[in-house]
């Protein structure tokens, strides 16, 4: 009997161990820690997704091979694809796409010129321009009235947008030109872009050409980069919605040959001259037809009444010492606000013509 119970005890122990092992192997997976697999609550901000841009096929374009500066390159002639979200390829047939030329034709005098831009008049809605592009032909995107978005790749070596490049792109609301650090030419580039509200100009740009933003009536604010030296007449004619302008330190205000003012907006409310500007000795730069606030940094040492054609009330606040007044008196009703702790204001003898001048210390 004792032997029997011993044998039964051994069997019972064996069965218990077997049951325990089986229960360990069948533990529900939901109870197993999942530290190697992130849950749905794990933030994904550390691994942002990047949209993959798929270039248009070469068959979407008429193009040719051209030798420029010892390099064989592709020139795009005309877009014939159906995609409305255009991604210009950076290479075709193993050669870099360098020039958005357009359709050319030789006239009776033997001169060959562009008669139709690459995308002119098409129904495209967006365009991505790769860094391989170096130049645009006439009216590249002109009259693309459905075009809403344009993106330039970083490192674009474009120096000129060509005449009427984006003319009459009436659906375009914003354009960021900051990647185009070598940009020089913008001749009538955005004429009649009547929905354009915001423009980001590149640091490195030195001139805004004639008619560049002609009739951009929805443009509300403008930040002029420090590199900008000159604005040619008519550049902002018809920008009747422009409310604020920030002026960089290198803009030359004096433009004696100008036949009209550079900024003439009835909506203008604020003009800010940024630190580093030394002279406000300009001619017909701003037409003041509504109450305007002007901020002048301490770096300014020369001012001129000719800079502002004031037909309303202008409040101009000086941060530094009283500058020297060159040429004409202030025009219209002017309120000058100044810091009484700065030099020269107690002896200020400024005056106004066709209006009143009020000196008002900042308390």
Predicted regions and their residues:
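Structural signature of tandem-repeat unit edges
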Residues: 65-71, 81-99, 107-135, 145-160, ...
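Short beta-strand/loop segment at the start of cytosolic alpha/beta domains
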Residues: 53-79
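Short, aromatic/basic amphipathic alpha-helical patches
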Residues: 260, 327-333, 343-356
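C-terminal motif of bacterial Sec signal peptides marking the signal peptidase cleavage site
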Residues: 20-23
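C-terminal capping region of solenoid repeat domains
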Residues: 41, 46, 347-363
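Bacterial N-terminal signal peptides that target proteins for export
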Residues: 1-12
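Consensus positions within tandem repeat domains that build extended binding/scaffold surfaces
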Residues: 137-140, 162-165, 187-189, 209-212, ...
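Short, low-complexity, disordered segments immediately C-terminal to signal peptides
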Residues: 25-53
């Amino acid at each position: 009997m004792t032997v029997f119970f011993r044998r039964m005890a051994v069997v019972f122990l064996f069965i218990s161990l077997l049951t325990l092992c089986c229960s360990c192997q069948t533990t529900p997976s939901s109870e197993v820690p999942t530290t190697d697999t992130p849950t749905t609550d794990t933030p994904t901000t550390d691994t942002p997704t990047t949209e993959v841009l798929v270039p248009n096929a070469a068959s979407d374009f008429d193009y040719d091979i051209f030798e420029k500066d010892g390099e064989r390159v592709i020139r795009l002639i005309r877009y014939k694809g159906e995609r409305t979200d255009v991604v210009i390829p950076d290479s075709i047939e193993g050669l870099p796409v360098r020039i958005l030329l357009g359709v050319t034709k030789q006239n009776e005098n033997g001169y060959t010129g562009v008669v139709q831009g690459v995308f002119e008049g098409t129904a495209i809605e967006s365009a991505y321009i790769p860094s391989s592009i170096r130049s645009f032909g006439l009216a590249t995107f002109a009259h693309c009235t459905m075009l809403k978005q344009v993106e330039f790749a970083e490192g674009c070596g474009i120096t000129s947008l060509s005449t009427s490049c984006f003319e009459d792109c009436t659906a375009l609301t914003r354009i960021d030109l900051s990647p185009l650090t070598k940009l020089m030419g913008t001749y009538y580039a955005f004429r009649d872009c009547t929905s354009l509200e915001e423009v980001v100009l590149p640091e490195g740009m030195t001139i805004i050409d004639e008619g560049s933003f002609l009739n951009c009536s929805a443009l509300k604010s403008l930040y002029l980069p420090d590199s900008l030296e000159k604005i040619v007449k008519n550049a902002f004619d018809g920008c009747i919605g422009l409310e604020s302008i920030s002026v960089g330190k290198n803009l030359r205000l004096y433009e004696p040959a100008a036949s009209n003012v550079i900024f003439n907006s009835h909506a203008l409310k604020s003009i800010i001259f940024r630190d580093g500007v030394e002279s406000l000795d300009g001619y017909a730069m701003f037409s003041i037809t509504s109450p305007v606030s002007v901020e002048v940094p301490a770096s300014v040492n020369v001012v001129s009444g000719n800079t502002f054609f004031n037909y309303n009330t202008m409040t101009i606040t000086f941060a530094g010492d009283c500058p020297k007044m060159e040429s004409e008196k202030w025009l219209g009703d002017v309120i000058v606000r100044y810091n009484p702790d700065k030099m020269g204001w107690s002896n200020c003898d400024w005056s106004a013509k066709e209006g009143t001048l009020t000196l008002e210390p900042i308390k």
